[in-house]
Amino acid sequence: MIMSKEKLIKSIREVPDFPIPGILFYDVTTLFKDSERLQELSDIMYEMYKDKGITKVVGIESRGFIMGPILATRLGAGFIPIRKPGKLPAETMEESYDKEYGKDTVQIHKDALNENDVVLLHDDLLATGGTMKAACNLVKKLHPKKVYVNFIIELKELNGKQVFENDQDVDIQSVLSL
């Protein structure tokens, strides 16, 4: 059975005032709790990238670790984590970025990717784009052939794609737009 994108959107839980007052949080975990929704989401994302020659799916901690390995398996690719500092055991590279309330940093293993890799960089949600932009910069330091960027949800009103306007070589797509 094919579920519409509208049904997927309706199944996303909205949590007001989380993590701070005034924020409406879109909880994508409701898409994962039922096998039909999870399969539909997996199928849609697979169809988006099945002909792109993806060799590595890179997921951003932590919700990028849910669909990332599923996509990697479906695409016949490896999975690479991007994590917060101090969580990866071997030699890493890092990229820092500004957030609305301070700075943050993401890291990847130095040997995670190479110039032959076609990368699908995945996270659950595009809001302001800061985390993904830092992750994309980090991945590009390892010189892959091509970088695709994917989100389950894009919050259109926050214009997160705008931080990528100078990255003409990066293909950015989302499954659902809110």
Swiss-Prot record:
Keywords: Cytoplasm, Glycosyltransferase, Purine salvage, Transferase. This is Adenine phosphoribosyltransferase. Pathway: Purine metabolism; AMP biosynthesis via salvage pathway; AMP from adenine: step 1/1. One of its GO terms (biological process) is adenine salvage. It is found in: Cytoplasm. Its main location: cytoplasm. Belongs to the purine/pyrimidine phosphoribosyltransferase family. SUPFAM superfamilies: PRTase-like. GO terms for cellular component: cytoplasm. Its EC number is 2.4.2.7. InterPro entries: Ade_phspho_trans (IPR005764), PRibTrfase_dom (IPR000836), PRTase-like (IPR029057), UPRTase/APRTase (IPR050054). Catalyzes a salvage reaction resulting in the formation of AMP, that is energically less costly than de novo synthesis. One of its GO terms (molecular function) is adenine phosphoribosyltransferase activity. It catalyses: AMP + diphosphate = 5-phospho-alpha-D-ribose 1-diphosphate + adenine.
